[in-house]
């Protein structure tokens, strides 16, 4: 059969299962319910909905508070070398892979792998475990940001001075550092900053350790409840509501980041901060940790291996040119990370000059930047209340759209397992409320007096780079060596009208697996047990709990392989062959098309059904 005829068969094969679904609940059509057919899934109402949702999903807190710090720590401009190697060798290929298999199969993060390779459907379960754990702790950052935002609506910022009930006799205002003679005299004593005391003694009420959980912080618990409610109402109606919310949440942070960038560049000391950020140190490339940081940053910032991008792609129309937009979104994501460094380090340079210290003494990453370094910087600027409100609104919006996109990915992956049940009526909305409630209750462990230790345990292990690298390796291995990169390229050509360059295919087959394995091994070799603030050492039971969180996702892949082999009858090699064969996209839709035979290469009791590219071949 000619290539054009094969592609026409693919087009006919998909035309029914990829229609939009204007039902009363996302993905449900009344006529489907009446006829007893599985509900069809909805689609994005416009292309911009998808673009903004993806942009909001992966342009988040890591772009602002993690990339700039890693860049300065790992050799400044020299860090961009391993960063771009991992970007083009693994980040963009895996990002596009997840989007395109979602679009091609019209399925979420679990069921797409059920169709592509049932034996390795554990990839989807691993992704859902990771994103479920991530959703529990990531939103706690937004609860902290909400608390800081509320505290910013005061004439005087509460972390600017030492005259509050939570301050200790050792509190020393940062303005004292300007007087170097006074500072040298008192620096031998253990004095602390009012910003640190506000963070540790007011916001966290930090306990001595993880084995001292203390009482619940009700103010933070209410902030956590508030952000979960916002997240719920942003996604409860499916992608048609999510696609509209991101018009604001995904664009407004860029405007505020631009304002902060302009303000930072006009401050004294900004030039020194930017030089510190980008000054290259090529010798740092000899350290394997630099390459590990580059690889893990790519996977974190592109939100891959979480099932979220696959779920977002599954709502695309079949003919949507996602390849073009994935490349543009990649430029946006990495460009935002790079520009954020100018905004952050210009302000850190100003703060270092004001305090008369080295920039290395004020540079922070993660929560240390968001809740210590930057709040301290705004107290030294004119109109500190205004800049504090602006910063924490930006932080909230950056985190919120990432959060509800990841929750949407989690929900879509789970709903697609039982579409006939969970897409009827208001069951999907009830299920979302249930998932959000459980996640909120688990998150309460992180807003106790010992909650910061629990938060760091989740952050260090549950969604660590090791887990993401593990999933990425199997994704590429299955597509390149089992399903076949050329077979997927056939589907891509049918969807977007042309075949992408071979770069993607070679990356899936060789480059990405090699980078993942190398980074995975070095991560284990360079592993350092978790500490808090470089002083508190976690007990052994907590370290064991952390590794249990990491293994809970990683073990899904081999565990599902064993379960599937045990559940399937027949000789071992026959079972393996059967489980490595893709399944039909949607049996009822296919049968309506009358495309038969499906089981011309049946392995067991007529149960084996070929994927679309094999079905086309049988119709020659």
Curated annotation (Swiss-Prot):
Pfam families: SNF (PF00209). Residues 1-42 are annotated as: Disordered. GO terms for cellular component: apical plasma membrane; basolateral plasma membrane; cell projection; dendrite; GABA-ergic synapse; membrane; microvillus membrane; neuronal cell body. Signal peptide: none annotated. Glycans are attached at residues 163, 179, 190. The keyword Coiled coil does not apply. The modification Phosphoserine is found at residue 322. It is found in: Cell membrane. Residues 143-217 are extracellular. Keywords: Cardiomyopathy, Cell membrane, Disease variant, Glycoprotein, Membrane, Neurotransmitter transport, Phosphoprotein, Symport, Transmembrane, Transmembrane helix, Transport. Disulfide bonds: none annotated. Expressed abundantly in placenta and skeletal muscle, at intermediate levels in heart, brain, lung, kidney and pancreas and at low levels in liver. Changing residue 399 to V: In HTRDC; decreased taurine transport activity; does not affect protein abundance; does not affect cell membrane localization. GO terms for molecular function: alanine transmembrane transporter activity; amino acid transmembrane transporter activity; amino acid:sodium symporter activity; gamma-aminobutyric acid transmembrane transporter activity; gamma-aminobutyric acid:sodium:chloride symporter activity; taurine transmembrane transporter activity; taurine:sodium symporter activity. Residues 1-18, 29-42 have a biased composition (Basic and acidic residues). Residues 1-49, 564-620 are cytoplasmic. Taurine transport activity is down-regulated upon Ser-322 phosphorylation. It catalyses: 4-aminobutanoate(out) + chloride(out) + 2 Na(+)(out) = 4-aminobutanoate(in) + chloride(in) + 2 Na(+)(in); taurine(out) + chloride(out) + 2 Na(+)(out) = taurine(in) + chloride(in) + 2 Na(+)(in); beta-alanine(out) + chloride(out) + 2 Na(+)(out) = beta-alanine(in) + chloride(in) + 2 Na(+)(in); hypotaurine(out) + chloride(out) + 2 Na(+)(out) = hypotaurine(in) + chloride(in) + 2 Na(+)(in). It is a multi-pass membrane protein. Taurine transport activity is stimulated by thyrotropin. Taurine transport activity is inhibited by GABA, hypotaurine and beta-alanine. PROSITE patterns: NA_NEUROTRAN_SYMP_1, NA_NEUROTRAN_SYMP_2, NA_NEUROTRAN_SYMP_3. Belongs to the sodium:neurotransmitter symporter (SNF) (TC 2.A.22) family. SLC6A6 subfamily. It is linked to Hypotaurinemic retinal degeneration and cardiomyopathy: An autosomal recessive disorder characterized by low plasma taurine, childhood-onset progressive retinal degeneration, and cardiomyopathy. Mediates sodium- and chloride-dependent transport of taurine. Mediates transport of beta-alanine. Can also mediate transport of hypotaurine and gamma-aminobutyric acid (GABA). Sodium-dependent taurine and beta-alanine transporter. Chloride ions are necessary for optimal uptake. This is Sodium- and chloride-dependent taurine transporter. It comes from Homo sapiens (Human).
């Amino acid at each position: 059969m000619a290539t054009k005829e094969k592609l026409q068969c693919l087009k006919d094969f998909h035309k029914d299962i990829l229609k939009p679904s204007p039902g009363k609940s996302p993905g449900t059509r009344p006529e489907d319910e009446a006829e007893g057919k599985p509900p069809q899934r909805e689609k994005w109402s416009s292309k911009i909905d998808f673009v903004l949702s993806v942009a909001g999903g992966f342009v988040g807190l890591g772009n602002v508070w993690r990339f700039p710090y890693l860049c300065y720590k790992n050799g400044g401009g020299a860090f961009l070398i391993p960063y771009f190697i991992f970007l083009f060798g693994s980040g963009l290929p895996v990002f596009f892979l997840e989007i395109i298999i979602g679009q091609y199969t019209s399925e979420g993060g679990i069921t797409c792998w059920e169709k592509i390779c049932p034996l390795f459907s554990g990839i989807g379960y691993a992704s859902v475990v990771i994103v479920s754990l991530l959703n529990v702790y990531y939103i706690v950052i937004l609860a902290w940001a909400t608390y800081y935002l509320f505290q910013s609506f005061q004439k005087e910022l509460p972390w600017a001075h030492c005259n509050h009930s939570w301050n200790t006799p050792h509190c020393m205002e940062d303005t004292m550092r300007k007087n170097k003679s006074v500072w040298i005299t008192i620096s031998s004593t253990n004095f602390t900053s009012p910003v640190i005391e506000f963070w540790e003694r007011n916001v966290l009420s930090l306990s001595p350790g993880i084995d001292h959980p203390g009482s619940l912080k009700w103010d933070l618990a209410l902030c956590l409840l508030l952000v979960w409610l916002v997240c719920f109402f942003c996604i409860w109606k499916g992608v048609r509501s999510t696609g509209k919310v991101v018009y604001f949440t995904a664009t407004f942070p860029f405007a505020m980041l631009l304002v902060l960038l302009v303000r930072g560049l006009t401050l004294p000391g900004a030039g020194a901060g930017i030089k510190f950020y980008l000054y290259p140190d090529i010798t740092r490339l000899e350290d394997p940790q630099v390459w590990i940081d580059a690889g893990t940053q790519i996977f974190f910032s592109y939100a891959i291996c979480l099932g979220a991008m696959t779920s977002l792609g599954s709502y695309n129309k079949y003919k949507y040119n996602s390849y073009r937009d994935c490349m543009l979104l990649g430029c946006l994501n990495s460009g935002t990370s790079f520009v954020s460094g100018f905004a952050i380090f210009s302000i850190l340079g100003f703060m270092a000059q004001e305090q008369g210290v080295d920039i290395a003494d004020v540079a922070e990453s993660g929560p240390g930047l968001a809740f210590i370094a930057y709040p301290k910087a705004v107290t030294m600027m004119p109109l500190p209340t205004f800049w504090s409100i602006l910063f924490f609104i930006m932080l909230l919006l950056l985190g919120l759209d990432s959060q509800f996109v990841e929750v949407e990915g989690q929900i879509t992956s789970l709903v697609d397992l039982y579409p006939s049940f969970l897409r009827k009526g208001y069951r999907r909305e009830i299920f979302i409320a249930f998932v959000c409630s459980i996640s909120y209750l688990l998150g309460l462990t992180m807003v106790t007096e010992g909650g910061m230790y629990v938060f760091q345990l989740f952050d260090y292990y549950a969604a660590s780079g090791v887990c993401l690298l593990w999933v990425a390796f199997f994704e590429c291995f299955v597509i390149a060596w089992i399903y076949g990169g050329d077979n997927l390229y056939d589907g891509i050509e049918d969807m977007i009208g042309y075949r992408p360059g071979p770069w993607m295919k070679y990356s899936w087959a060789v480059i990405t697996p090699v980078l993942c394995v190398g980074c995975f091994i070095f991560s284990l070799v360079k592993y350092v047990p978790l500490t808090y603030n470089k002083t508190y050492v976690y007990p052994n039971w907590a370290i064991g709990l952390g590794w249990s969180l990491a293994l809970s996702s990683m073990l899904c892949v081999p565990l599902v392989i064993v379960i599937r082999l045990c559940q399937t009858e027949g000789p071992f090699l026959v079972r393996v062959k059967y489980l490595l064969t893709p399944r039909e996209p949607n049996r009822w839709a296919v049968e309506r098309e009358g495309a038969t035979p499906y089981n011309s290469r049946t392995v067991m009791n007529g149960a084996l059904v070929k994927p679309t590219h094999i079905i086309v071949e049988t119709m020659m």
